[in-house]
């Protein structure tokens, strides 16, 4: 059995095409049940019915005060955003939620979560629903955040 595992590991490292690269590294995002991940040219979108969450990773220089940096970045990402809450995160990480409302006369346009860690890597999750259903967007974002990890450790802290 050990021999088989060693051979498989050697093949994995010999043929990197077999190894899937994580586009969100150092963050790890599990695809929720009922959703699929569609990869476009430079973009990654989690799709569940008519609900979409676009995930973007922006490598950055680390900040000394990540919460203050996130407060600035919310409005750089979306000048019309309304910052809502900081999420309870693992030590060294911070996350803030924001929303953009009624820019097109259809209620909530998008919900955003910006996550920043000690490495400086910024993960942005920006969700919307084609029918304007805020509950479906929130549900997909919650499922993504529930399974968000770094080195197999959960980032969002629950009570």
Model-derived regions, located:
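Sec-dependent N-terminal signal peptides
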Residues: 4-15
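N-terminal export/targeting and maturation segments
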Residues: 21-38, 43, 47, 52-53
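Conserved polar/disulfide-associated segments of primarily extracytoplasmic proteins
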Residues: 40-133
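Sec/Tat signal peptide C-region and signal peptidase I cleavage site
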Residues: 15-21
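Surface-exposed amphipathic alpha-helical segments
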Residues: 26-35, 125-159
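Residues embedded in well-ordered secondary-structure elements
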Residues: 6, 24, 35, 102-103, ...
